[in-house]
């Protein structure tokens, strides 16, 4: 059976469903339309469509179905059971196509009335395009909606084993294998794992941390820092960092404009998806049901994906280029290292997993933020801490915009990878399912909670938290490198000290 394309509109009394049935000879005899409670079932071989609506319909004499030969479509009109009832999310085809049970509990979240009070406003005054946006959130309201979601990592027995022979699973909910190794032979240089098919989750974290340290160039970072702080106008113009720090991506501008005009900014931002976005949801996303045991890694993956997207938009000033997918892939650890665990854990004798002392005191969200910054200081052209923090602030705005604004960003990301001849594999192993799952089962409350926690962790972050293992010297006898741990603030202090010394003692 083929799922046809469709579009839906409504008025106070009716739902109007347009079903496209191109390239077949229409026969009214073979047409079957069933209306049952909140469901419409359409069948005309080889097409089959089953839609579930948020509210109930009624099949009476007012319902009609007419074939339009010019547009090759069938126009179905069905009455609402309750007149003037508004049907939500009619422009989310993936959600309408979901099977019974897929949506159950998607927005359920137990409120925690004893949640801690946040001490800082979630949005502070930020300069955007020269306009001061004084944005203040109702922290108590957001806390009640979101703080009930527990972002702590659960300690449990590790049921998976990897002896170096068995393939490991990766991607969305660890459903995939084999795909990435095939793509590397076709030129997939986003992948950084030496052996993606036989590296387990914890070893991916270890390999990622090691390679981030090797990739980070202290001299490059310090040069960018000194240019930004002490460079003249010509240096800043050549470097471009000054203009990038002023840039705001279009999707963030949409939120800020809505927030400025809104009479109740604590609500989620209303989004009407374009025809192109609706077509993308119908044609390019899988129609699956998902039974995910642990949804926290999926929301943290969305966090990292959004950061990579926003940073790429800033870096390219809002225009996707041939390098956009590469940039986003490199900045996102769940893509470049297939790393959805993020935290390194140690194996104990009883088989339990213990969080490594390196990041034991950090939450998963804080590690996601730090990882994004570390990678933003290692891979792109502009490696600037303020730029990375600005990107995280913009991620917060997208999350505060609500589920539909996040969907808009995910659709843009998905499309960028879909059009690439090699990198499209990351749609297949992650972004296809992640986007479809979030459309059908993503929760406004959890997104609000994620925004709250992300903002809290970001505000508590400092340059001292961004550490790298750097080569200090080489052993004279063995020639092996000797390493030392430095945070980026220490690097800046050393560079400024050397700069002042040069200014005082010019050659």
Swiss-Prot record:
Q: Annotated Gene Ontology MF terms?
A: unfolded protein binding
Gene Ontology biological process terms, A to Z: box H/ACA snoRNP assembly
Record's keyword annotation contains ATP-binding:
no
Q: Which PROSITE patterns match?
A: CS
Q: Which domain of life is it from?
A: Eukaryota
The entry sums up its family as follows: Belongs to the SHQ1 family.
Q: What is this protein called?
A: Protein SHQ1
Q: Source organism lineage?
A: Eukaryota, Fungi, Dikarya, Ascomycota, Saccharomycotina
Supply the gene name: SHQ1
């Amino acid at each position: 059976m083929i799922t046809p394309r469709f579009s839906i509109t409504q008025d106070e009394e009716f739902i109007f469903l347009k079903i496209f049935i191109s390239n077949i000879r229409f026969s009214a005899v073979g047409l079957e339309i069933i209306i049952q409670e909140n469901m419409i079932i359409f069948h005309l071989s080889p097409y089959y469509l089953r839609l579930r609506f948020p509210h109930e319909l009624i099949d009476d004499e007012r319902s009609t179905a007419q074939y339009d030969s010019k547009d090759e479509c069938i126009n179905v009109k069905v009455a609402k059971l309750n007149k003037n009832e508004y049907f939500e999310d009619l422009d989310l085809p993936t959600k309408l196509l979901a099977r019974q049970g897929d949506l159950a509990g998607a927005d359920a979240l137990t409120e925690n009335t004893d949640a801690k009070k946040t001490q800082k406003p979630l949005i502070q005054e930020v300069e955007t395009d020269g306009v001061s946006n004084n944005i203040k959130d109702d922290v108590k309201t957001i806390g009640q909606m979101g703080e009930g979601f527990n972002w702590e990592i659960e300690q449990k027995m590790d049921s998976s084993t990897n002896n170096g022979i068995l393939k490991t699973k990766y991607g969305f909910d660890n459903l995939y294998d084999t795909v990435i190794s095939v793509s590397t032979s076709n030129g997939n240089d986003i992948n950084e794992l030496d052996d993606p098919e036989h590296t387990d989750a914890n070893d991916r974290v270890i390999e990622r941390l090691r390679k981030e340290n090797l990739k980070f160039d202290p001299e490059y970072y310090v040069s960018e820092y000194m240019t930004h702080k002490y460079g003249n106008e010509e240096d800043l113009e050549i470097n471009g960092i000054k203009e990038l720090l002023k840039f705001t991506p279009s999707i963030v501008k949409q939120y800020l404009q809505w927030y400025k005009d809104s009479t109740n900014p604590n609500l989620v931002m209303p989004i009407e998806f374009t025809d192109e976005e609706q077509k993308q949801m119908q044609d390019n996303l899988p129609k699956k049901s998902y039974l995910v045991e642990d949804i926290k890694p999926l929301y943290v993956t969305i966090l990292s994906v959004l950061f990579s997207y926003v940073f790429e938009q800033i870096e390219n000033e809002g225009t996707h280029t041939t390098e956009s997918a590469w940039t986003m892939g490199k900045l996102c650890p769940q893509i470049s290292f297939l790393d959805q665990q993020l935290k390194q854990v140690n194996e104990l004798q009883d088989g339990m997993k213990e969080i490594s002392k390196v990041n034991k005191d950090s939450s998963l969200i804080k590690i996601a933020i730090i990882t994004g910054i570390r990678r933003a200081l290692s891979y792109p052209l502009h490696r600037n801490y303020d730029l990375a923090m600005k990107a995280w602030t913009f991620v917060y705005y997208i999350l505060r915009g609500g589920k539909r604004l996040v969907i808009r960003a995910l659709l843009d990301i998905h499309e960028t990878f879909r059009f690439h001849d090699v990198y499209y594999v990351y749609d297949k192993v992650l972004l296809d399912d992640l986007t479809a799952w979030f459309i059908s089962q993503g929760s406004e409350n959890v997104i609000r909670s994620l925004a709250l926690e992300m903002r809290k962790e970001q505000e508590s972050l400092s340059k001292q938290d961004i550490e790298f293992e750097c080569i200090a010297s080489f052993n004279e006898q063995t020639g092996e490198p000797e390493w030392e741990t430095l945070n980026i603030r220490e690097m800046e202090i050393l560079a400024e000290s050397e700069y002042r010394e040069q200014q005082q003692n010019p050659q």
